[in-house]
């Protein structure tokens, strides 16, 4: 009986090695953007194609628009839409400093009438702004540019594609552990540890990169990059307490504001140059 158990363990380890090898073979190391003035240089590991993620994002975006339109919650305020689209246009024009190919994306910008304080930019340039963000924060144009620049940066860096790839990688240790031990409890524990060790740190890196690129996009587009600091102060006041940095996919409010102050100083000359044009 003991011999049979060892046999299964050996087979599980062999299968686990094959799974890991297969996953790694499907990944590639890429640099999705130029470094810019802020110096974003991290290599990224991708296991799925841009085309797959872009197609899925476009489909999801279409469904969101259809649902919002059905509920009469899409682009309700014409003046608000014009304001948002105007800022988006200026920001998108600056994406060439990080990704020349982004000018060929099918950019779209829409406003969802909702109390949510939220915004996003899906892969391929599908932007969504919630009216609650504008109304509850009494947001200025500079602050709105900070939000949108941050979200556009996620798309430029293809963070969704990277996260999907990392989630694929994160499943492997738990699966191997379940095969080797036959224990679902241990498999769940393995996935939890993998999440904290692999997925969360990468997510914080993604947020930092989005802050870096976002403030530069805003500055180059003629928006005061220092508005990112006041924006996150407002967000922190509105949101109340936040989870500790170790267990969050976002940097803590205090450390984020410090980083934004440093980044704003780096790109402030770009803002001053843009105002002279």
What residue spans do the PLM features occupy?
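A Zn2+-metalloprotease active-site environment signal
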Residues: 2-17, 24-277
């Amino acid at each position: 009986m003991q011999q049979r158990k060892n046999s299964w363990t050996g087979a599980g380890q062999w299968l686990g090695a094959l799974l890991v090898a297969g996953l790694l073979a499907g990944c590639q190391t890429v640099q999705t953007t130029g470094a810019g003035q802020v110096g974003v240089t991290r290599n990224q590991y991708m296991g799925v194609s841009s085309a797959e993620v872009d197609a899925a994002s476009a489909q999801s975006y279409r469904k969101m628009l259809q649902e919002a339109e059905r509920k009469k919650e899409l682009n309700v305020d014409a003046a608000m839409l014009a304001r948002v689209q105007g800022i988006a246009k200026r920001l998108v024009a600056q994406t060439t400093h990080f990704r020349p190919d982004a000018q060929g994306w099918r950019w779209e910008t829409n406003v969802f009438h909702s109390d949510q304080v939220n915004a996003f930019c899906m892969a391929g340039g599908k932007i969504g702004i919630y009216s609650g963000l504008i109304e509850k924060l009494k947001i200025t144009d500079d602050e709105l540019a900070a939000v949108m620049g941050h979200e556009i940066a996620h798309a430029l860096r293809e963070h969704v594609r990277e996260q999907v790839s990392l989630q694929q990688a994160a499943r492997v240790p738990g699966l191997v552990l379940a095969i080797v031990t036959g224990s679902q409890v241990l498999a769940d524990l393995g996935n939890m540890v993998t999440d904290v060790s692999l997925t969360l740190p990468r997510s914080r890196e993604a947020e930092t990169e989005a802050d870096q690129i976002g403030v530069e996009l805003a500055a180059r587009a003629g928006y005061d990059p220092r508005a990112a600091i006041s924006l996150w102060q407002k967000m922190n006041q509105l949101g109340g307490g936040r989870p500790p940095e170790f267990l969050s996919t976002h940097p803590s409010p205090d450390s984020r504001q410090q980083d934004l102050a440093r980044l704003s100083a780096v790109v402030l000359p770009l803002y001053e140059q843009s105002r002279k044009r």
